[in-house]
Amino acid sequence: MGIEAADFDKYDVVYVSNAEEHQYLDSYVPKKQIGTKALSSVLVSLADSGNGLKVSTYNINYCTAGMYKNALATAGVEDANVIVAGPFPLSGTAALVGTFEAYEKLTGKELDESVVDAAMDELVTTGDLEQSIDGDSNDVEAMIADLKGQIASGKIKTPEEMEQAIEKLADKYDLKLSDDDKQKLLGLMKKLQGLDLNWDSIKNQASAWAVSYTHLRAHETAAN
């Protein structure tokens, strides 16, 4: 990230322990994957209102920029620039915890624990899907953003409507979901629906995802 230890006094520095990683993630991630040390780092800066979330990663091999973006939006983080980095390839789970704590310190807004827990669940569910599905991570992340956007806009409300939406979006994004994958998604969406989230922000993020996804696919088509 280009920041030397001597420059730390220019920043608000938050340290995340490995114990905090386990506190947030043990319910969703095998302890072996979390490890015994918190090594990833994150730089968070606030952006002007309406700029949305921008995330970039370096040396992070489990969490993608899209995974962070979706989870952060769920937790209520908005209008921020986030850089996540590791000294060598690593999972990046500590950085997500650090991002939440840094955002709270920067804004003075305390994030609801149940919402943060749901964001962690979303991150891990997304990662599990990306590992189990023979597909592009962008497709999985766009589908989840799309699902959340439909809940935010009131297009889907009941579990039955969620199941139908999952089926339709799997086709839209050309993803082959197993029954277990579908149940994980359904469980996550039901959890999110039951929380007091910033649904306007989630709806805006879903729209931004749709635009970036369209540009990505158009670029790939042009390259081919």
Residue locations for each model-derived region?
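Soluble oligomerization/assembly scaffold segments of membrane-associated complexes
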Residues: 73-175
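N-terminal Sec/ER secretory leader and immediately downstream segment
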Residues: 1-77
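Conserved small/polar residues in nucleotide/adenosyl-binding loops
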Residues: 214-221
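Catalytic-core signal marking the mid-to-C-terminal active-site face
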Residues: 155-213
